[in-house]
Amino acid sequence: MLVHLSCFLIASTQRNLGITDWYQHAIIAYIGVLIVYFLAQVPLQDLRKYILTIYFLTISTLLYVNFSGTSALGAKRWLSFAGFYIQPSEFAKLTLILVLASILDQKRFSDLSHLMKPLFVSFLPWILVFIQPDLGTSLVFGAILLGMLYWSGMPYEWAFIILATFVTGLLAYLYQFGLFIWIPIIGFLSYRSLPHKKKLITLLVVFFHSLIAKISPWIWESVLRDYQKDRLILFLNPSQDPLGGGYHMLQSKIGIGSGGLLGSGLMQGQLTKLKFIPEQHTDFIFSALGEETGFLGTLLVSLLFFILILQLIKIAIEARTDFESLI
């Protein structure tokens, strides 16, 4: 149901253009269903034998894309194959899940050194996707890592220490005096939550956060591109640049609000029809859903996703092994 609805919405954002992205979307979805069916016949423990090979193939593909991939809108993210555009970073997400499941199935967290291997295997695809550049997908890799670490039993304090890295970076750029309070708090939590090698690992954690504090302003000024900075700033305040970087978000809100309770009907959205939102079929497809199906339509789709997530959690809980549960 979600796949078919998404095809209608993509077609709605590209009406009068003939067979466009919705057609490729539908074909890839049906091919994906077939692939899932055949993969479901393969025992996961057998698949585990090939995880290292799959990981190296994925890294090799990401390297190839960075040097010889197809460029669009200033980013080199795609491979062209038989008229279709394939984004290897999407497959890299699945690969990372498999690799992390294999690693975390064998580990029980007793000190922070057990995080090194999961962090390393996550870092390689993350950095290769980040330099394409694709900030959004690279952040997804971080979410996958944290989610799987949590599910595998990582202590809450460690999760906080990892997430605190982002706070350290923000403070370094916005309020450096706060670091004199923040970093000692992180050090105290590290010392309190570690069963072994407390002093050494606490010093390493404090050193790491101090390093993040030192390089964060440089990353913001020299590494992030202007459009990436705009996305991060305008996410909180799109009205700061209503005709520039904040235009998409503001128009999307208008489109969603104009849908009212029942919406204008599929393929009938006026803002969508008049192309008020450029490239609406990508990150802003939800605005077409809100305009054309209204509040009830967005509520239904949100409910379908909620049911899907609950079902996935149920499957993970009932899995026979930790490896299967993590996947």
Can you name each region flagged by the protein language model?
Residues V3-S12, N16-L243, E291-I327:
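Hydrophobic alpha-helical transmembrane segments of multi-pass inner membrane proteins, especially
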Residues H248-L262, L266-I327:
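Helical hairpin unit composed of two closely spaced alpha helices linked by a short loop
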